[in-house]
Amino acid sequence: MNKVHKPLYFYLMLFFSTTIIGALLLYLPFTGKKPISFLDALFIASSAFTVTGLSPVDIGSQFNILGEIVILLLIQIGGLGIVTVTLLTLVFLNRKISMKNRFLIMVTWNIDEPGGVIKLIKHLAIYSLVTELIGMICLCLSFIPKFGIGKGLFLSLFTSVSAFNNAGFALFKNNLIDYSSDPIVIITISILIIFGGIGHFVVIDFINCKKLSKLSLHSKLVLTTTSILIIIGAITFFLLEQFNTMQHMGLVEKIGNSFFQSVTTRTAGFNSIDIASINKSTALMLMLLMFIGGAPLSAAGGIKITTFAVAFIFVLNYIRKENNVSVFNKEISDKHIKLSIVTINISFLFISIITFILSIINPNISLIKLLFEVVSAFGTVGLSMNLITEYHGITKIIIIFVMLCGKVGLLTLLRTFIPPKSPKNYRYTKGQIYL
């Protein structure tokens, strides 16, 4: 077994064992207000640990405070990454971090060099906890007057952690629909989602950089693409839904909720409107945003905005017949271009196959609704068109598999189980293919 496969196997073992432990805790009677099947407990644990947000039951009425704390911890560990939490524990105990463990972080976060790995996870932990604390304080302004100090504090903490880690779990029966007119909740959660979705690397780079022109290429690409997608998504959602799901709202409220849904759709999965009632055209737009997802080195899922941006720039440059693929006066390497194209293709193929299988198992459900659920699970978003309560046992197992694949990454899984070929010392002559 080569040096790449050993960390991958260990990472997957940590990942699956944590999910199983979480499921067992949620299944036990002392964490719930009423009995729950183990499959539903496994589904919720998987959804929390992959920071997706899908749930076959209302977690607010299903679980007591202990169960909600278990879900909260799964979200936090899943957002930071189980490997990151493990190594942070070793750092806290003043234990030496071996090269094997450093390589494990590199594999987990797709980092090319081992240098600065410990500094990276320290910054990640501090950034996450500080941002979540600030978000909690802001949400307290709305929740404490409504629920009192004790419950208000916990709701603020849970919602802040869920938002920053792009999980989309809420302890309210209708998610955030009842708070669609509350500016404190909508704005705070939107900011938390954005900060969680762009990653700490970009934020630290932005803070340390005195001029925007001096930002790293990664930060420029993440910030630019994120801004464009949020604006386009908000405008499109407003135009498509202003006379549908938002017809009862005023103009300012429509704009605010359009912005919120554009932000949350790519990564988090909170909803301030009824997703089951949106137009088909809106559903297609939301699926595209969920497929793209957030930034690398963050809690967000999807193919990642940098992958989308690089592929888009490559196609644009190819149409223009430009020899080099470049952006912001920097050339993009062939390695990253190939990786982006491969990621998009295998993700599209995976989603298509899973949707095809689910359409056979659930012949009475429309294809667009099934596709929406699969894309949401794969992008670890958590938006649902209210189909989740209708899932059969086999459908739940498939969706769990999709969530895990979306969180771990298809390429990571394929590299784990498909051994690499030895490099060849020769090359074949080029052949002609007509396209």
Language model regions located:
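Membrane-proximal intracellular helices of multi-pass ion channels
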Residues: 1-435
